[in-house]
Amino acid sequence: MKILISIPRKVNFLLKNISYIVFLSSVSFLLCYSLGKCNLGIYEGTYGIGLCQVSPSLLPAAASSPPYVVAIDPGHGGTDTGALAIVKEFEVIDKTAARLYELLEDDPDFIPVMTRTDSDPESAQRATVANNAGASLLISIHANSDSHKSSKGFECFAQPPGRTYHQDSYRFAQLIVAQMSAAGHHIRGDEQKTGIKYAYYYGNDKKIVDSSDSQVRSRKSFGILEKTNCPRVLVEQCFITNYSDVERWATDDGYNQAAQLYYAAIKEYFKEF
């Protein structure tokens, strides 16, 4: 059976339990041949949006023109609550991510995708959601914690040196830090206070280095930074163990402001794209 489907340029879609593929542009067609239990062959026009379950071998390339798919990765959720301190990490993440999603959804240049909803998939599964959607950029949102209540401020993790998307990842991280710094957030880091770090795992031990350390290492970084096929940055929005950070960045006003700053950095990233 041959089916011709016309689909609008920008759609909202939910990725839950099954993976979908998104072909981006303005007007075109998606032609599916269905035999038995959803065995599909896919043919897509030069310009078009369609949704269809497909094999990983047919995943789309990231868009080189708007609308861009931006993956928002809530770093914790479901039964994975993250750190529990003055506030709960997953609540900071969830509310900030939801506000960022709304900002991107209202902008015709972007199609936002959440890598998780109310479940707790592993980082590899969340990366697959972003990859299947053809994400051009990913931001993974977290909140920090420390046994020392004086620890405060913003930092983020770029894809480490030597990786495919390191330079673009670092550029995106710089744009985020610039937004946070302009908003008055304390920027963490070495004497240069870049706010950008790299993470490496040596067995169960994690090593954090500042971005001034440009040594190429083969050790794996955070899972979401390793498995996503686009530039990506993991942000630590604030310390939920520090009262001043919580008051500024872990309230409704704080979630709104952080989302606005991430959105501004995303806009700037693609402006330079």
Identify the residue ranges that each predicted region occupies.
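Catalytic-core environment of secreted peptidases
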Residues: 61-85, 139
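Active-site-proximal helix/loop segments of hydrolytic enzymes
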Residues: 8-24, 28-62, 94-273
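Glycine- and acidic-residue-enriched helix-capping/strand-helix junction motifs
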Residues: 82-95
